[in-house]
């Protein structure tokens, strides 16, 4: 190809592009939005739906002509990297996104092991990052981390509304706590114990079991004959299911269970043998919702992904609303590149999307969540007003 | 009759037996004598197939070469191995019963009864762990265990090792008695005077080769004998 | 209080019987072949999956358990033929190979079956009262089955011809060969028998606990503690040690701390090695 013809082609393409954007009304820009998450490996059950939710939001925004900043329309383009459920791969993925100078905001990662290296690198590079994993709570709000956000509520935030609802729903008076002997459990036991007391429930014993325990019979015996009516059973599905199953086996133990995890799966098989099981849905209940906004979102999700709703699908709502909020924050800040200004606008913004959500002054999400309940053989959910 | 032709045994580069040939005539006792490491045990172990060997081994017209140990036992060859190799945590009865491992149960029971009648001490100790017996008693159990398979050829490695003189006399008596029943016996023995007392023929081994062969008096009188034993 | 102690004791012997089954296979293979088979735990895991999938497909637990046992018997025989036969006489090679096998089998299982824990429907559920005692139905069933298998296996070793040959071989390989025992064949069969026992233990584990690709690790470590505690190669030692460990864990978790559960076994082992350096039943006394 000769130099002349090449230049001519470039000019032609440019003209076409300009004409195309002119058709949208104004000269359109493109905002690159980074996504990092485990698209493969054991953590993909969280991060694949999370990416799907982001893609839905982006498609919807772009389909409506993009979002406006200072009267100019912008389209969003997602640049995605796979963290492979491993911390080293996650760090590499984060580096790749950081090397693209057009990326000013990154979202993704719902699990702590690959999440921590991503969040720390983003904070160090002063790039705005909205994550979802629990350990993010220890990063958000620290001096120097003003650009770090978490799109899911902290334990404390959820617990405040969760405990009173649970106590009322299950009619609890005296509970025992049986959780793994690890940092996560120790932190949330500290948060939940006083909340139970405030709700008029006596926490008569707390037992920590060795992580990886499969046989709970001996430790469950400690809870026998204590007049308990409920058990608080940690945050991991396999532990919770084993404890429920073995409580029924051992006998003479409470049949009401409070679960800090995000799924009703541990109790499904035992629904007609137990008196109650409650869990936390950190976004919205998709399985048995009566909320019109949720129902409409489900239809859009099915159309966009050609997938059915499964137990993990609700993680797709982690970043869905946050993408819209980001657009509004950029508009309010009048910039798509000044991260400090955008972050400042995001903090304190209240957004009534599929989730009703906001970010506090530190960057922690404060959002309404749903509480999942299995009782009397039925599965349903009730909304928890947090905001 | 047990015939050995050009038998060699080697462990890696170390040749323990170097192409020896000899025969044990029916109903006779032949003793392999020689110092430690002369190749006596290797020869016995090669005959029962515990170690691999080259050459030809024929027992009562049946070629044993290449057969597994259990098949050689089936063809009537039994061995009392070095160290007796009893099952120390099994009772005397179980040890003897295992001697009839390849035989029919009825035959085995019958032989056990006969042996216990012949050696009342076995019956007395029947329920005791073999490991708790005295050395002489253990030797007796080991020989009787080998007899349980009704062998035609019996190989015994060091029948007197570690035994008191009074016990050695008893073992001698037993071997003579077995000899009287027409059993073909090959023993490997370091104790030359014992070997001379029980055997019809002696074969002197040194460094895996036969140095002398003949009646006990012939072999004991030869200068090679003193050389092989005393290294002079 | 007394009632509680009895209940806790029963919990202990129930899991102890499972531990003993796994330790039995390890100690047998070591006693006869001199190989510490670290891949033994994988037979537990694969047996659990075989049972899980059969039960999930609508077959009864009994079909699942029997097929798991037989399948793991075949698996043990294949492992012996393909791998351990080549490492005979070289314990270090055997050790290295079995460690490698753990990695391969576990990771292939994790890739093919996903690492998600699965729970199988047990043939019986709930609990029943015996006087003032409240017993878990499935645990009682597991205890009965595993005790029957252990007792059956012990009787097999004591009284059957092959069982006597196995014991004889563990006490004197040469002596056994000279009475006509085919020592090679018996060595091979012991891999199959040990692995089949582990498969049966796996099916029983699956009826109580979660099935995961990594579930073989705990029974394996415990099996080794037990085999060492009982005196390597000793069948009565391994059985006694299995029940002892079950009791220690059960009483430790109940009356001390549940967060130290797996530590109790090691404490017993350390004390045993200090004060009974040759295992529960002394040096070479209580072999197979």
Q: Where would I find each of the regions flagged by the language model?
A:
Chain B
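Glycine-rich phosphate-binding loops of nucleotide-dependent enzymes
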Residues: 1-232
